[in-house]
Swiss-Prot record:
It catalyses: a quinone + NADH + 5 H(+)(in) = a quinol + NAD(+) + 4 H(+)(out). InterPro entries: 4Fe4S_Fe-S-bd (IPR017896), 4Fe4S_Fe_S_CS (IPR017900), NADH_quinone_OxRdtase_chainI (IPR010226). Transmembrane segments: none annotated. This is NADH-quinone oxidoreductase subunit I. It is a peripheral membrane protein. SUPFAM superfamilies: 4Fe-4S ferredoxins (SSF54862). Pfam families: Fer4_7 (PF12838). Its main location: membrane. Residues 52-82, 92-121 form the 4Fe-4S ferredoxin-type domain. Its cofactor is [4Fe-4S] cluster. NDH-1 shuttles electrons from NADH, via FMN and iron-sulfur (Fe-S) centers, to quinones in the respiratory chain. The immediate electron acceptor for the enzyme in this species is believed to be ubiquinone. Couples the redox reaction to proton translocation (for every two electrons transferred, four hydrogen ions are translocated across the cytoplasmic membrane), and thus conserves the redox energy in a proton gradient.
Length: 182
């Protein structure tokens, strides 16, 4: 009989403890957000939508080197190289299939010109899969993104039209690598 009384006391204690816990949660700060009205906090290094940036001169930064497409583990990036009259490469078309993209950031790390950057934008839901395939016009933004002063062609030392490399003002002569061989 004492066993039954002990079970009743134990059950009553369990019920009271549960009621106190439920009552206490009514006065706590809620964990859920009323999303679109309340914006979600995203950490600074959040990897969201991919964009193509421009250099400080307003030209496309992408040189169509194809490193981003090679680095992509799911193969969602495709592009075709074209060349301007002065020898500068640019992508004739640049396409990202966001229905396959896993937002790993490997394309951003592989890009030598910092043309590809991941933004904290994550609202890309759509009803049709073909609407998740973004072309170059959809990806290009007007600004330089995270690196505002970087210009690949200034750093890489591209030849000026009509002058060989090393002939510009304050520019060192190019090194002949074959002369360094034994």
């Amino acid at each position: 009989m004492f066993k039954y009384i002990g079970d009743i006391v134990k059950g009553t204690g369990t019920q009271l403890r549960s009621m106190v816990m439920v009552f206490g949660h009514g006065f706590r700060k809620r964990d859920t957000l009323q999303y679109p009205e309340e914006q979600v906090y995203l950490p600074p290094r959040y990897r969201g939508r991919i964009v193509l940036t421009r250099d400080p001169d307003g030209e496309e930064r992408c040189v169509a080197c194809n490193l981003c497409a090679v680095a992509c583990p799911v193969g969602c990036i495709s592009l075709q190289k074209a060349e301007t009259e002065d020898g500068r490469w640019y992508p004739d078309f640049f396409r990202i299939n966001f229905s396959r993209c896993i937002f790993c950031g490997l394309c951003e790390e592989a890009c030598p010109t910092t043309a590809i950057q991941l933004t904290p934008d994550f609202e890309m839901a759509d009803f049709k899969r073909q609407d998740l395939v973004y072309e170059k016009e959809d990806l290009l933004i007007s600004g330089p993104g995270k690196n505002p002063d970087y210009n690949f062609y200034r750093v890489a030392g591209m030849a000026i039209g009509g002058k060989p490399k090393g002939a510009a003002q304050n520019e060192a002569e190019p090194i002949n690598v074959k002369s360094l061989l034994p």
